[in-house]
Amino acid sequence: MSSQNQQTDGESIGVKTGTAGSIHVENLTKEFDTQQGHELVFEDISFDIEPGSFVTLLGKSGSGKSTMLNIISDVLEPTSGEVRFETDDPSEEVKLGHVFQSPRLLPWNTLVQNIELVHEHNPDFTRELAEKYLDLVGLSEHYDKYPTQLSGGQQQRVGIARAFSIDPPVMLMDEPFSNLDEITAEELREELMNVWQELNKTVFFVTHDISEAIELSDRMLMLGDGRIYGDLEVPLDRPRRTDSDEFLRFRQKAIDTFYSIDD
């Protein structure tokens, strides 16, 4: 289903539109111990992400993007520094949604069952809710199909629906469209924009694709040489046409900044 036809409001179909969270990264340093000694990935990095914003972390392969995301996800411990999350309710533990390069679906479960699985200890989460999250990503005719019956793009939509279904104030996405062909990836970018705008979440999105970062984000952080060396606000109205003069002008500015580290 084309995202251009998917303008459903989350609340109107019974999907909760919860509070977005802020991310505070303070003086973050990460080193790995190797046989050759300490390998510095990045050092003394600080940035803040406002609630409800869409921020991309852009960098070349090996720049430390996934390491940064894993620290923010609490999968890795930093060498020093800290990451904090905040919402309007200080007593609420901030849940994090995750979307990976591969959707990691269980092939023996239907789409609905794959979503229900992450709610197995929540008696209030019903099949109807699982179906509504699938509706949000254009899979209303596929509830009881199995992942192997879907295309790669459709499987990734299930991964997105599953991540949003836990109502996370913060969504972390690690190059989720990098394994897809460009036509399918573009369809999913549009779907993601619709869902993000409907559900009011903070998104931190890792990519190596400059055009993708501009199309999606409010702000672009550029990681390289162990530091954040670029921090660009994206001043373009939504929806964004990647062939517009405004987009192409800003893309050139972003390219100049991105490759300035090589000068």
Language-model-derived ranges and their functions:
Residues S73:
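Helix-to-loop junction immediately C-terminal to a conserved catalytic motif
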Residues L58-K60:
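The feature captures the beta-strand-to-loop junction immediately N-terminal to the Walker
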Residues G81-V94:
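Conserved ABC transporter NBD signature motif
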Residues I160:
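Hydrophobic anchor residue at the start of the ABC signature
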Residues D33-Q35, E77, Q113-E128, L136:
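ABC-type ATPase nucleotide-binding domains, specifically the catalytic core motifs of the NBD
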Residues K145-T148, I166:
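Conserved signature/switch motifs of ABC ATPase nucleotide-binding domains
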